[in-house]
Amino acid sequence: MLFSVLLLVAILSYFWGVFSLNDQKKSIDKFVNKFQPQNQLDQKYQDMLIRLDIDSGSLNALAGIFARSGEFNKAIAIYLIALQKALTKSQKELIFLNLGKAYLKAGFIQRSIEVFLEAIKISPKNIDALSHLGLGFEKLRLHDKSLEVLDALQEQGVDVAQEIAYTKALKLKNSQMEFDQKVAKMAKFANDFKLVSRMILELFIINGKDINLINIKPDLADCLDILYLNDAILDGDEYKELYSAKGQNQTPINNFELKLLKTAKQNKINATLSFSYVCNKCKGTYPLFFYRCNHCARLGSCVIIPNLIKENDEECISF
């Protein structure tokens, strides 16, 4: 009797496993078919990769090569094929994660969110998937959802104090709240994310407010571009070198670029400053200031680089 029961349990367990695998395969096929029409990989190459005896791990590696070279459409197509060939949950989880990153890099934000959620279904504590899911919500300005993800990361012991401060400040900045109340609330997050002070300076300038009413003033290194291009003068010893370079006082200058600018003006050379912006982590260079690097997603990594140029000219002055 006992043997019969054990045999029945074993048989049921076997068929349950078969049905479960079939359900998973149908789910994967349905997911892949949803995105398949947008693939940019030639159909003959897709068919070849499907037919050949190439495992999901090898396809995942191949897709990664295309992703690293910026060919995201090809990478996405191969990840989708790899997903169909994945046999284990861990394989599927990894491919979902990499596929989501490719969609995110390619600018398909909503799709990336859907894919990261699939990875999280398999492993709810996947820190990498949660982090990138939060980035997707941030790009779509879904600040509340982004904060929910950050809370989940914090519960796992991840230090996200800076990200939480930035997200809450960003939510306030984009809100319709009354100006003084908005600024006061934003200032509370400056200790956890120091560039909140730059965000507040931007708000003052955009709204035509007196910038000397700011309680928490940003470091000059974090706002050199804004102050140089703005006519208003921000009080404080830290800023005197900048205004000396602009000819508005006689403070001695230590900063090399500012000293060059002042020397050029004293010698009647038509000179001004332009600015480029470099990520101190990945060294990516951008034409505009950023709070989060678009390439490596590092928060607060922007370094402002002043360049001396001929006024009304893009050509740098060499000395």
Where are the predicted features?
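Hydrophobic/aromatic packing residues within the alpha-helices of TPR/SEL1-like helical repeat arrays
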Residues: Y45-Q46, Y79, F116, L150
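Short coil turns that delineate tetratricopeptide repeat
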Residues: D53-I54, L87-S90, P124, V158, ...
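N-terminal signal-anchor transmembrane alpha helix of single-pass membrane proteins
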Residues: M1-S27
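Cys/His-clustered metal-coordination modules, chiefly Zn-binding fingers
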Residues: I216-F319
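TPR alpha-solenoid repeat register
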Residues: S58, K92-I95, A129, Q162-I164, ...
